[in-house]
């Protein structure tokens, strides 16, 4: 899988950064793209990338602030003409997301040529699709804001060839049945496939956060995540300033990384007060501390393998 950022600024765009938008490429598990938040100008950002709107099957909105949703109506309209015709879309988000989209379409007399399934979250959500499990949990941002825990399908354990040979089953097409089915038959006897496979391995876990100040659900969402995408609107200065506005400070994120045993953290939603030079200088200062966990300040069009 791969995470790509189409917008990394907080609140307002800058000359260097667009407002929030993240793409999650599900390959090799699926040929689909999932978007998380669609800030103003997202569809224009996507034009500079190989991702096609027709491959976007799901959009997850973290919360209803404008820097996370103002690009949604335009992107949905353009999807009709960029490979999305008759391809269903699932839109997940807080209560009000359906009304927002439908009102925008109605008032602009825009017409989509594909169906949308709306899923509005009430406190929390567990959603299953193509072997993936997505959990949404409420954060603390003053308005309903959610974090998403995306769990890829389990990888089936390796076939124990010697054990199969011991029952007289030599390598061949039957091995695929052992790998992909719960049971298989050989010489008139039914066997449990799990007895001839190694332990299954949980697929990668990606945690993607909406805006929030520290809260207990953060640890639920990010526990043992392979990759965490988290906001740090404030990356210097006093922490209470961030928390007073229901946002996170870089110190909050570092604490969460350690508490939740996160392997890699990608920090986005940086205040427009910081330019690229500021961010690079702060990064160099932070990594001088041996206690600083593994993280990156991301910029628009950055991509990271999961």
From Swiss-Prot:
EC code: 3.1.26.11
Active site (record annotation): 67
Annotated InterPro entries: RibonucZ/Hydroxyglut_hydro (IPR036866), RNase_Z/BN (IPR013471), tRNase_Z_dom (IPR027794)
Residues annotated to bind Zn(2+) 2: 67-68, 211, 269
UniProt KW keywords: Endonuclease, Hydrolase, Metal-binding, Nuclease, tRNA processing, Zinc
Transmembrane regions listed in the UniProt entry: none
Cofactor mode of binding and number, as noted: Binds 2 Zn(2+) ions.
Cofactors (names): Zn(2+)
Binding-site positions, Zn(2+) 1: 63, 65, 141, 211
Signal peptide: none
Catalytic activity, as annotated: Endonucleolytic cleavage of RNA, removing extra 3' nucleotides from tRNA precursor, generating 3' termini of tRNAs. A 3'-hydroxy group is left at the tRNA terminus and a 5'-phosphoryl group is left at the trailer molecule
Any GO MF annotation of the entry: 3'-tRNA processing endoribonuclease activity
Keyword Plastid belongs to the record: no
Family statement drawn from the similarity comment of this UniProt entry: Belongs to the RNase Z family.
Subunit structure comment from the entry: Homodimer.
Function statement: Zinc phosphodiesterase, which displays some tRNA 3'-processing endonuclease activity. Probably involved in tRNA maturation, by removing a 3'-trailer from precursor tRNA.
Protein's name according to its UniProt entry: Ribonuclease Z
């Amino acid at each position: 899988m791969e995470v790509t950022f189409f917008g990394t600024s907080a609140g307002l765009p800058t000359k260097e950064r667009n407002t929030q938008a993240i793409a999650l490429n599900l390959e090799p598990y699926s040929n689909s793209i999932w978007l998380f938040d669609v800030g103003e100008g997202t569809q224009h950002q996507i034009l500079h990338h190989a991702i096609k709107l027709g491959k976007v099957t799901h959009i997850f909105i973290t919360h209803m602030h404008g820097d996370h949703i103002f690009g949604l109506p335009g992107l949905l309209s353009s999807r009709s003409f960029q490979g999305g015709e008759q391809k269903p879309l699932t839109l997940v988000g807080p209560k009000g997301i359906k009304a927002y989209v439908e009102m925008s379409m109605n008032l602009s007399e825009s017409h989509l040529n594909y169906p949308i399934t709306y899923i509005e979250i009430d406190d929390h959500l567990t959603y299953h699709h193509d072997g993936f499990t997505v959990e949404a949990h409420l954060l603390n941002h003053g308005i309903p804001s959610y974090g998403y825990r995306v769990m890829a399908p389990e990888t089936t354990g390796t076939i124990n060839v010697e054990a199969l040979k011991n029952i007289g089953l030599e390598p061949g097409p039957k091995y695929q049945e052992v790998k992909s089915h719960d049971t298989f038959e050989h010489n008139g006897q039914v066997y449990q496939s799990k007895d001839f496979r190694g332990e299954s391995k949980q697929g990668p876990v990606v945690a993607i956060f909406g805006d929030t100040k520290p809260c207990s659900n953060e640890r639920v969402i990010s526990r043992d995540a392979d990759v965490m995408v988290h906001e740090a609107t404030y990356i210097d200065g006093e922490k209470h300033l961030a928390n007073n506005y229901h946002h996170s400070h870089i110190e909050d994120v570092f604490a969460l990384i350690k508490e939740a045993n996160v392997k890699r953290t990608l920090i986005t939603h940086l205040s427009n007060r910081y330019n690229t030079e500021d961010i690079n200088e702060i990064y160099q200062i932070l990594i001088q501390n041996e206690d600083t966990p593994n993280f990156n300040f991301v910029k628009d069009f950055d991509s990271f393998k999961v």
